[in-house]
């Protein structure tokens, strides 16, 4: 059924192209009849149909219709609508409407003590919203979306990201530096099934196509819903069921749309500390339908004040007796720490509604948004036949400028950044940057590094990396080669190969620190927190989606491990101090077969190349499991063991934007494990913490081959202080989190016998408890943690949780 659905889509598109010669383009403009000023976003509709569009910011509009006779209606709040009858035998370029303004009346309302007349209007609007929602069983609508990126200078990009220049005066004009356009079909079926299909997309030459996925379906907001998600927070809409308890309303004025009286009502949260909307909503008298919103996010919804403004504009019209959105406009301006100024505009028009028609359940699968494989191949004839928002002169000039800049040959120095981790030679090949050419350890001493990386080759199917390193103290040359090839329409299967002969970090899976931090700590304090061993071998693995919620994998690995030793005593300071010994490992050759699975119930976005999982900010749970098998006889391995691992991650929305994160890990070993293959409880260095680690444990302090760990973090954000209405604190966006960790660890007797070192374990549960304090815009938080048992000399710690390290 799914294949037949997409076949139907293809046939529909083909039919559209074939009938293109019969279509006629209508261009026009809507202005104020008295002043000649454009009426931005005016509503255009073909009489007695479900077809229409909305003007751009300059009042310009486009319609594509078949040859025939039509009545075109232009309307705008505060103006009398105008209707023009046309016969479309050829293209029309000047179908201009000059609307006559109606009277704007300031309210002369008798206000009884304690009675706000706006509240009764809102109460009836909420009732109207709920009755209208009960009528909507399903819908299909087409959407055209245009996104505009504005920066102080032209942006750069590769296949995975966009780069924005830093600096510029606050008075520097923002220029259009990127444009995205797409055409989509969007489906809804009660109670909460959504699907969007991008049929065609195009963008300026400096924008990667897979970024162009914002369209008119679930990813956009509908102010007829109860809650709207902005910047990670669920905000009550102006007509939500609890809006009367959350917002303050005031009638600002009344206007007319033809003979229909329209109330212009000002809205803001009752408490300025509550996140929400401020601005104007427009509600029709007698019918009490919400017909337009023009709102901005208040300061409480704008965490850290990163955004100068977030302005949302949306209009509604009646289709089959139901009010539905006909456009969506989002205008964002941001000034990031005074370093980066950026603007973003999103303009969407929705047209050709089909209401309450039968929709197959096969449409609504795990892919909430799908980009059709040929969406990037549509030529100019397709776009001529598709309703769009006409380009302004500024947008057309930007397209021309950007395309000419992208034709300039690639310049190495244009992409060189001293502090980056890589230097792009072209869009797919990069090499190590100066920052990545050196590292230091007590085993290797001064080391030179070089890497070459290939990304997204062969239509984004092939990735590879070759890392080379030489240590001047251990006098060893190391190599690490990885390659992966992706299969399937959405690259859901991968064949991976890794060949290595390198120095490995001991218990590296439990070490979340960067190499730069390790180098600096070692050179400055001589207290290197890492240990090492040599390993060489290879690994081969195949993994992929067996079902949309199930990924499986299997592979084989071969490795030979040997101990490493301290080979230098160099340091910038503390030259008389000796480095600690590097612990020896169990020398061994281990061959393993592994099988595993991942279960992920989240929906995903098919961006034309990949499936990107998303929970849309909602709760979710993930599971994964692996089995590793080693045998002396069957695999010629030095040790016999079977390792069973299980992991789970749970994310639960609790109070508004607050959330609970739960991570569970368990490992059981049947057999004998080499010391270097034990699982070390993730610890930390003195004052720099990582999330989902044991803050009061040192790195590699406790380990085992039978493990159970539980990490719980409740991120209250600033919701707790808002809920408690704590004076002052509630207005400063103080982020609070509660942290609890628990662990069990043990060793098999056979593992103890071959271990070259004593291994600390927790045969009874180890507990620690603490909290973190941060501020919304600051990229780190201070955490305070206490041991609840196994108390020794390190029972309390304070540290910075800094993800950047």
Predicted features by range, described:
Residues 103, 108, 112-262, 268-276, ...:
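Structured extracytoplasmic
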Residues 53-54, 80-94:
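Structured interaction patches on ligand/partner-binding surfaces of diverse proteins
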Residues 87-113:
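Extracellular beta-sheet/turn segments enriched in Thr/Pro/Gly and aliphatic residues
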Residues 235, 368-470, 474-805:
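Exposed, low-structure sequence patches enriched in small/polar residues
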Residues 49-60:
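Short, acidic Ser/Thr/Gly-rich low-complexity loop/linker segments typical of extracellular
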Residues 46-48, 73-84:
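A short, solvent-exposed loop/turn motif at the edges and junctions
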């Amino acid at each position: 059924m799914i294949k037949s659905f997409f076949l139907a889509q293809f046939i529909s598109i083909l039919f559209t192209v074939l009938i293109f010669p019969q279509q006629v383009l209508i261009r026009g403009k809507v202005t104020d009849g008295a002043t000649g000023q454009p009426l931005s976003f005016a509503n255009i509709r073909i009489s007695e149909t479900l077809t229409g569009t909305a003007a751009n910011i300059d009042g310009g509009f486009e319609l594509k219709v078949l040859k025939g006779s039509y009545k075109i209606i232009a309307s705008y709040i505060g103006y009398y609508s105008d209707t023009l009858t046309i016969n479309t035998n050829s293209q029309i370029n000047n179908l201009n409407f000059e609307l006559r303004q109606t009277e704007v009346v300031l309210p002369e309302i008798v206000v009884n003590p304690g009675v706000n007349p706006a509240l009764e209007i809102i109460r009836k609007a909420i009732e109207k919203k709920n009755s209208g929602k009960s009528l909507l069983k399903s819908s299909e609508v087409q959407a055209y979306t245009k996104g505009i990126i504005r920066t102080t200078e032209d942006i750069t990009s590769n296949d995975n990201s966009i780069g924005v220049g830093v600096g510029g005066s606050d008075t520097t004009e923002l220029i259009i530096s990127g444009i995205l356009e797409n055409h989509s079909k969007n489906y809804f079926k009660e109670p909460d099934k959504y699907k969007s299909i991008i049929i065609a997309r195009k963008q300026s030459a400096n924008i990667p196509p897979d970024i162009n996925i914002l369209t008119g379906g679930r990813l956009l907001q509908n102010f007829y819903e109860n809650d709207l998600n902005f910047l990670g927070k669920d905000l009550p809409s102006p007509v939500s069921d609890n809006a009367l308890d959350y917002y303050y309303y005031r009638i600002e004025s009344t206007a007319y749309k033809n003979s229909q009286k329209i109330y212009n009502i000002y809205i803001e949260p009752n408490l300025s500390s509550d996140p929400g909307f401020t601005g104007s909503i427009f509600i029709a008298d007698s019918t009490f339908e919400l017909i337009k919103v023009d709102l901005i996010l208040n300061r409480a919804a704008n965490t850290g004040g990163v955004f100068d403004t977030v302005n949302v504009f949306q209009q509604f019209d009646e289709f089959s007796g139901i009010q539905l959105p006909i456009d969506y406009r989002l205008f964002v301006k941001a000034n990031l720490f005074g370093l980066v100024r950026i603007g973003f505009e999103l303009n969407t028009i929705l047209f050709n509604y089909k209401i309450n028609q039968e929709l197959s359940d096969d449409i609504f699968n795990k892919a909430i948004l799908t980009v059709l494989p040929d969406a990037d191949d549509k030529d100019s004839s397709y776009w001529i036949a598709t309703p769009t928002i006409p380009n302004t002169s500024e947008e057309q000039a930007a397209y021309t400028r950007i395309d000419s800049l992208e034709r300039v040959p690639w310049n190495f120095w244009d992409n060189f950044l001293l502090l980056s981790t890589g230097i792009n030679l072209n869009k797919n090949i990069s090499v190590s940057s100066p920052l990545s050419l050196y590292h230091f350890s007590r085993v290797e001493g001064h080391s030179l590094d070089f890497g070459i990386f290939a990304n997204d080759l062969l239509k984004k199917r092939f990735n590879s990396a070759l890392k080379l390193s030489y240590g001047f103290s251990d006098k060893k040359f190391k190599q690490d080669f990885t390659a992966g090839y992706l299969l399937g329409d959405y690259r859901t299967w991968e064949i991976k190969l890794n060949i290595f002969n390198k120095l490995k970090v001991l218990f590296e899976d439990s070490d979340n620190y960067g190499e730069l931090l390790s180098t600096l700590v070692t050179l400055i304090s001589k207290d290197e927190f890492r240990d090492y061993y040599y390993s060489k071998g290879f690994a081969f693995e195949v993994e992929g989606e067996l079902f949309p919620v199930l990924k499986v994998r299997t592979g084989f690995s071969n490795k030979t491990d040997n101990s490493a030793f301290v080979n230098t005593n160099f340091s910038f300071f503390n030259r008389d101090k000796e480095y600690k010994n590097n612990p020896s490992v169990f020398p061994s050759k281990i061959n393993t077969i592994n099988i595993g699975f991942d279960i992920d119930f989240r929906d995903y976005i098919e961006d034309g190349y990949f499936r990107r999982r998303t929970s849309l900010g909602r709760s979710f749970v993930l599971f994964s499991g692996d089995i590793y098998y080693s045998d002396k006889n069957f695999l010629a391995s030095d040790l016999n063991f079977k390792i069973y691992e299980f992991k789970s991650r749970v994310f639960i929305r609790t109070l508004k934007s607050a959330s609970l994160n739960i991570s569970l890990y368990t490992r059981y070993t049947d057999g004998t494990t080499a010391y270097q293959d034990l699982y070390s409880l993730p610890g930390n260095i003195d004052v720099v913490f990582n999330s989902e680690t044991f803050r009061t444990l040192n790195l590699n302090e406790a380990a085992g081959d039978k493990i159970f760990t539980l990490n719980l973090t409740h991120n209250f954000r600033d919701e707790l202080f808002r809920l408690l209405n704590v004076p002052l604190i509630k207005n400063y966006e103080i982020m609070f989190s509660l942290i609890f960790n628990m662990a069990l660890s043990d060793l098999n007797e056979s593992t103890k016998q071959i271990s070259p070192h004593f291994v600390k374990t927790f045969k009874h549960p180890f507990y620690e408890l603490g909290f973190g304090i941060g501020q919304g815009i600051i990229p780190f938080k201070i955490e305070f943690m206490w041991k609840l048992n196994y108390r020794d000399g390190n029972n309390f710690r304070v540290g910075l949780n800094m993800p950047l390290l």
